Amino acid sequence: MPRPGCTLAPASESKRVERNHLLKSIRLLGVAIASVLVMAVGVANASAAGLTGAGSTLVAPLMANWINGFEIKEGIPVKYGAVGSGAGISQITARTVDFGASDAPLTPEQASACNSCVQIPWALSATGIGFNVPGVKKLNLSGKVLAGIYFGKITKWNDPKIAKINPGVKLPALTITPVFRSDGSGDTYTFTQYLSKISPAWKSEVGYATSVGFKAGVGAKGNAGITSTVVKTQGAIGYISASYLIAAGLGAAAVENKAGNFELPNLKNIEAAAATVKSVPANNEISITNPPASASTAYPISTFTYAIVPHNAQQKGFLQQFLNYAITKGQAYGAALDFAPLPKVVLSAAKKAISTL
């Protein structure tokens, strides 16, 4: 019941207020990250007073907590620019920052250009599939359907291929607007790697990388940009880091895994994907997209994200302190943001890599 003297907003007004609230949440997340993290792109190497880093927007919400906790514990300031994985790799390669952050491992060409850089897994999360379909709260999607949408071959939400895997759901005859990252992005890498494992056509025609030539849709910069676009656009779909989905209140699709189950990007399912890692290669490159069917509850677009750091760095001591904090005490900040703790085998590999810097 409304309080005396108050009137209820009409339904259309309520929807407008709700949408504005979601957009405000996304903006506030961006502002919060910016106020703690953002530095000028191309900033000079950090002085002895602290560290600078740049890269992944996926890890940015967790990074904000790491930075705050590390500064309180050690008194060492850290600045971070959430500029995307591709830009982060470029900046650490140019040595304009002390560390890069990327959800995609270095390619052989990038590793060579970075000159003695080491990639260290330091966080574990997922790329979710956010959607804005009026009246639809729960949605199942398969890799084949997602490939069809981003190929531009599935264009309506009531397409039979979508309806078949969503029995009982009333799907509207609404045009689908696929949204993709316009900047170099680890989320793009993870999403397109999953599609490449599912669809031979996608693998041969598009492939996977931090930037690819999407066949359909509209581009948006950063996780905040793609989230905002999906929230504002009826019929839109986009691949978005799980923590941004939480902040925006967007619906997340349950995605089909190799066992044929449709799973959400929650902690339990991310951990199930990561549990398939039994060993870590020397270069620390780990892929957990579309894991084996034995991981029956795994979310299939889960990913590790990496710190990219050079050997014998000017700030070696501070870097080792910060990296060790991130992979140990810093993991406690993750659960509220849909970051799962590193599995023991990965944690061990990360500690070993840090010790060799």
Which residues fall in each region the model found?
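Short intrinsically disordered, low-complexity coil segments enriched in acidic
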Residues: 1-3, 30
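Intrinsically disordered/low-complexity terminal segments and short unstructured peptides
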Residues: 6, 24, 53-56
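Short stretches within intrinsically disordered, low-complexity N-terminal or propeptide regions
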Residues: 11-13, 34-36, 46-48
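Flexible loop/hinge segments at secondary-structure junctions
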Residues: 46-357
